[in-house]
Amino acid sequence: MAEVFPFLNGTIHHYQSVTSTQDQIKTLLGDFAPEQGFLCVLADAQQTGRGRHGREWISPVGNLYMTVALRPKGQRQYLGLYAYICGLALYDALKPHITAADIALKWPNDVMVNDQKMAGILMEFHHDTESGEDFLLIGMGVNIISAPEERIALNMVGADAVKPLDIVEAFLGAFEHWQSSYVEQGTADILSTWQGRGWRLDEQVQVKLGSEIIKGRFGGFDEFGSLIILLENGEKRRITAGQLYFGNEKMDG
C-alpha cells in the first residue's frame, strides 16, 4: 500500500518497495485526472530499477527513486526540451545541499558532482492503451546515502540530513518553474541556462550512435534541443540521442 498525498497541483504516491517506479506509475495512469498537473511515484527501494539503455540501477534503501508522469505541453517536435527542463530542475533541487563541491549537468541526463555521477534521469514517452492518452514518464535516481564505485552520494559532500522527499518536493517546484518558462517564453532561456551549467562542454567529445562514433566539439543546441557537434571537417551534426564521451573517456561496450 502507498501513502498518497497532494503536493502543488499533483499527487505523490509513496511506497516502501516496488519492482521499479517506472513500472508502478503505469498502473496508476488510469486514475490520472485531466485537471492534475502530474502524478509522482516515490519508493524507498526498487527491486529491478533501471537506467538508460536498460542498465541496472542499484537501488538500496536511503537513496531517491521516483518517476513523474505528466501530459507534456507544447508541440511534439519540442518534446526533447523536457530533458533540459528535468536537468535544470534536478540541478536546482540538489544545488542548495552541495555548497562545497562542483555540480554540473552532463548531456543528456546526468548530474555530476566533483566529476562523478550523483543522479540520472530516464525519460520515456508512454501510450496508455486504456485511456488512449500519451504521457511523458520521467524516472529519476539520486545517490543520497550510498553510491556504486566511481559514483558519488550527497552524504559524501557533507549533505547528511537530506531526505528523499526533500529533493522530490524541490524538484517538482523547480520543474513547474522551468516548464512555465518554456510555455511562456520558448526555448532560449532553458537552453542557455543548461549550457551555462553543462559539464566539460569545452572539450573534444565523441558521441556513440549504435556502431557509429562521431568526433568533434560542442557547438550548442538547435531550437528543438538537438545537440550540435562541430566535426573536424567543418560540418555540423545534430544529435538527438546517444552516449557522450569526453577526451579519452572509456566507451561502454
Report the location of each language-model feature:
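Long, positively charged amphipathic alpha-helical accessory segments at protein N-termini or as interdomain linkers
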Residues: 8, 14, 74-76, 80, ...
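N-terminal lobe of the biotin/lipoate ligase/transferase fold
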Residues: 1-99, 127, 252-253
